[in-house]
Amino acid sequence: GEQPTATLRQERFFIGDHQPSDALWPIPLFANQPLDDILTEREKTFTANGDVRLNCGLNGHFVTHYDPATRDRLIEKAAELPTLDKICLLQDMTLLARSGRESSAALLPLARVFQHETNERVFNKAGTNLVELRKFVDDSEAGRARLKQISAEFARDTFMELGWDEQDGESDDDRERRTAALGLMLYGEDSAALTEVKRRFNETNPDDLPAEIRPLIINANIRYFEMPEMIDKLFTIYQNTPSADLQVDIALSLTSTKNPATAERILAAIQDANIIRPQDASRWFIYLIRTRENRQIAWNWLKENWSWVKDTFGGDKSYDNFIRYAASALLTRDELNDFTKFTKPLRAEPALTRTIDLGIREIAGRVALIERDKAAVIDALKN
């Protein structure tokens, strides 16, 4: 029969708005079979021996976009690849999805291939792909339920293997994998994990919890078992602990509340220097606005309290943080329109002009990505 061929074509890679580019580069291919070492032309066809894989060993600075059939075969066998090639595939797929060259739905089968991965970087990257999908189910309850279920399933074997507690002589890889797996189990509302997380929180002082999983333990207790006295206790510890790490863990946890009254209390504390120091205020704000249930509350607060932000941070290089952080979290078309409208009069301030323009671009890109891929992602989650 005829010798199979593979055609390689190069073009400049962009995410978001851009001017077209016809630049050509000499590209070292690092292929899995003898092709040219370097691709210098726009397009070239080679005889191929089976599927071509490029950038083996993650040596090149380029993104590889395979045709759908090759991509699917590659995903199927991805668990057998060398570690760096797994990382390459995961990184490229994320970038291709963000740029609109691949559907974000393709992140799902690729992530699930690495369920039994022992390398921490690969396991983490695959888990991060599942996290990337959360923005697509922001307003779909059925989609969220499926993503939670899939996230817990993905992490369960790894977590059962490693257990809750660090073993003597355990590798850094195992420590990192435990944290990633537990995070996915708790997002997935695994009932055994939630029962244990509650027990540990009730029986141990927050500062005595193991540092690696402490933020996850406190966070899950606020998210799923919140009681008013818990909030009081954590605010008190926050104000009195000498540990900056514990303060960050408490801020991350309190802001994950599902209770609007607690969110309002946090926003009041942001304006009270006796509770939250001004230099930490924007950190609390970003954690809060990134929590699905609190995004609108935090955004409304920013609009209503802008004069306080200006009075407090106007002369400081952190002044634009609140705008930048809001832009990193907003994700619906209504939120984009509202952000644009609110920031329009602020653009006249030189300290804010660039941040506002970048923010509008960032939200618009996210909205376009969600509108483009949402149906396909929800469909992939169903199957």
Model-predicted regions and their roles:
Residues Q10:
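Short beta-strand/turn micro-motifs composed of small residues
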